[in-house]
Amino acid sequence: DLSSAMIEKARERGGYDELVVAELTDYLGLNAAQFDLIVSADTLIYFGDLSALLLRAAHALRPAGWLAFTVEKTDDDADVPGYRLNTNTRYSHSKAYVTQALDAAGFVLRAMSQATIREGDGEPQLGWAVLAQRGSALSSGAPAA
């Protein structure tokens, strides 16, 4: 997490092997082939362009590693190219954009379904629940030297 206060709350709660104060994309870029699985629930709503993050996730995964995440769904998915910043300061993403961004980063989409990802103001917030696997061909998601 970026917030040391949130890390402290997580530390108090317990149950974690490691807690790190870091920006997500930077952290993934510094951990080449370290993970078999990356799970990100309700985090990527703070990213518009997912390209760099997905490249870094592929870089951080071991061969054939898995990536599971959620993003908010655009209201009218067919008419929205890519992603947009909403009035609640969260981004929503179209299905086509997520699919294209995964492919460009070297992932194979294994499952993508509409789901309620959270409740907000008493209303269900619809999103995409995504499961992807790192493909054999991998673009370089390593940090620039």
Predicted regions located by residue number:
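Class I SAM-dependent methyltransferase SAM/SAH-binding core
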Residues: 1-28
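A short beta-strand submotif of the Rossmann-like class I SAM-dependent methyltransferase core
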Residues: 21, 40-43
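A short acidic, Gly/Pro-enriched loop at the edge of an enzyme's catalytic core
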Residues: 25-38
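A short His-aromatic
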Residues: 45-47
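A short glycine-rich, Lys/Arg-flanked "PGG" loop and its adjoining helix->strand segment in the class I
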Residues: 51-66
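Short, glycine-/aromatic-enriched active-site segment of Class I SAM-dependent methyltransferases
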Residues: 69-90
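Short alpha-helix
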Residues: 90-106, 112
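Core SAM-dependent methyltransferase catalytic element
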Residues: 105, 116-145
